[in-house]
Amino acid sequence: MKHSRSARWKLIAGLLVCMLFCRSARAEEILVAAASDLNFVLLKIAERFERETGNQVKISFGSSGNFYAQIQSGAPFDVFFSADVDFPRKLEAAGLVQSGSFYEYASGKIVLWVRNESKLDLSRGLTVLEDASVRKIAIANPQHAPYGRAAVAALESTHLYDTVKSRLVFGENISQAFQLVNTGNADVGIIALSLVKAPAMEKTGRYYEISSADYPPIRQGVVALKLGAKKPTARAFVEFLKRPEIIALLREYGFEVDRQ
């Protein structure tokens, strides 16, 4: 009887070890290039994905245009989240994307943002940028950052660009533009709503949402790249974005998602 019980426990222990080993053996690591407006929310999405699948997601954040150039040059990313749809579509046309993997996951928004100690009256909207006290206005570099292009478009549509262009300072991406304001190196910034919606940032400053009529829609796309074709996890991570709880999380961070 004792021998039978001992053998049973050994069998159970062996099965548990095997299950853990097999899961570890199957686990994959994917490398993700992501636009920096996703800096907070994508980390949460990746954590949920890792918990459910046992796979690992390593994310590099930066500007969409820089990642586009790197991927064209052979950078070993498996998934690319862009802050627009043009860069993923261009990669698709170049044959660098897994067929059918493109997904327009959200649309972003831009806001005026200042630190709490700022005396600027944000209720005035973009016209507050005309104040003489505003010496530096941070935006993402419009040459390779979609949020930077949206900021310029908003300034042009409100006839403010010529007035303030000499005071613009550029971050390499939207996260760096945010940091310029957060560290006091700029007085105000035109940045992504998704960054100021992060719990860690909500108490550090104030924001004014810029009318979406003042800039083109910031439609954002993701693709699984051909370099990740041997990793089923790459495509699975893209599909994970379509789940209702992930869509709800994106909306919580200020994104618009055209899904029911």
Segments predicted by a language model, with ranges:
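Short linear sequence motif anchored by a di-proline
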Residues: 8-10, 26
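Bacterial N-terminal signal peptides
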Residues: 10-21
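Exported/periplasmic ABC-transporter solute-binding proteins
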Residues: 27-54, 58-61, 65, 69-75, ...
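N-terminal secretory signal peptides that target proteins for export/translocation
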Residues: 1-7
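Bacterial Sec-dependent signal peptides at the C-terminal "C-region" and cleavage site
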Residues: 21-27
